Amino acid sequence: MENMENDENIVYGPEPFYPIEEGSAGAQLRKYMDRYAKLGAIAFTNALTGVDYTYAEYLEKSCCLGEALKNYGLVVDGRIALCSENCEEFFIPVLAGLFIGVGVAPTNEIYTLRELVHSLGISKPTIVFSSKKGLDKVITVQKTVTAIKTIVILDSKVDYRGYQSMDNFIKKNTPQGFKGSSFKTVEVNRKEQVALIMNSSGSTGLPKGVQLTHENAVTRFSHARDPIYGNQVSPGTAILTVVPFHHGFGMFTTLGYLTCGFRIVMLTKFDEETFLKTLQDYKCSSVILVPTLFAILNRSELLDKYDLSNLVEIASGGAPLSKEIGEAVARRFNLPGVRQGYGLTETTSAIIITPEGDDKPGASGKVVPLFKAKVIDLDTKKTLGPNRRGEVCVKGPMLMKGYVDNPEATREIIDEEGWLHTGDIGYYDEEKHFFIVDRLKSLIKYKGYQVPPAELESVLLQHPNIFDAGVAGVPDPIAGELPGAVVVLEKGKSMTEKEVMDYVASQVSNAKRLRGGVRFVDEVPKGLTGKIDGKAIREILKKPVAKM
């Protein structure tokens, strides 16, 4: 078979700012956290309760839990899981697992029973660390997933409903008076050892278990500490996050922050006033958000009440952010732009990131160090040059080891040459900025035309009466699919279906008109990270409009 690769059209990331350091992900985290512990730095702050955890306290508890897990009988290749909403204790089992070479599978108590049975059935953990909120579901799942031997309560100092608290689990499984300083991290084969089992986004069915190695994680740490693609390492810097920790975006930004000595200020639920007050009170220099929250901030009438002069960066990830909303929010916060990143669970974290001082409206960024990317033609699979749309493919040391017990699905996404096919449509310009247009599977096929929902969503969001919108294809026997939209109107505003359709028709080419109709809804269906749920939108659009 002829080699279709044209090297001129492969985009390479730069050399890393710092070489990747020796040791497992656990060994590196312990070394960094020990350094910040000696400085007295704060690791986590719960902005709602005011509770702080210093690096010294967090490291001590994580090391003691690591020792307890070893004494319980977990060895390299063992498995533990979490089932919890964001809480300040969330990363203690994560760190403990990384310290001893045990794979960690994070889930969230918001999962349905079916999703949790599926997810924990893939990772087969021996121990599940559950929040009090998640306990009932985990107890039920244990009846089906027999690998689960022990349930430990993550967010309680005392035993709860007959289940051991994490503190008491540590006491029971470590010698009296044991100190974290005596704990020894376990060395592992970095390239092979699974560090985390994350859930794929599951946009085409139930999620798959994504195996990420210690090599994947330490490469991510080098990006987190890179002053151009990550952060200036400055212990004590306060960063506000409202991103779910169980998700790849929340997991790897937070672990990266711990390597930098940052104070991670958490908001366990989003409320506009509390959010702005927290930014002010903790003098946060950066905030990390999912796109859903940008629309709220863009229309906020409270911004001027607060002193946000310390804020120098807003970062977005977890789902695509429209160019218009990003620019509008940046203007409102007096910032040059919004820092974006693009990645998949299968690529560990973002592999395209806005470099410091090099943002371009609408772009996701440039290829990170140690990675390369290309755009291929959807039909011929040939590598394309600048400004030509195709499927984005990437290659580098953060690609997953594979899906758990699913070699067939692994081969479908990573080809024989080691390129991961993202399933996203995009292009890059002459300056090597990448633009992600839409999901390949989301494209609406109308009479042979390919219509990207994200483009129509962006058009809808520019209308002053429209607060939020989502677009999907409605099956049609003649055209294949018809573009349709669900729309949330601004408070106090009104529009008819025809007015919305006429507005879109005035902005787009003929094939992109909303022939599938418009439905007015209270909320656009979205996942936890703000990804629009096309399947749910399709179901809404299929239903007949209720007659008054």
UniProtKB/Swiss-Prot annotation:
Its cofactor is Mg(2+). Its EC number is 1.13.12.7. The keyword DNA-binding does not apply. A motif (Microbody targeting signal) lies at residues 546-548. It catalyses: firefly D-luciferin + ATP + O2 = firefly oxyluciferin + hnu + AMP + CO2 + diphosphate. It is found in: Peroxisome. Keywords: ATP-binding, Luminescence, Magnesium, Metal-binding, Monooxygenase, Nucleotide-binding, Oxidoreductase, Peroxisome, Photoprotein. Produces green light. This is Luciferin 4-monooxygenase.
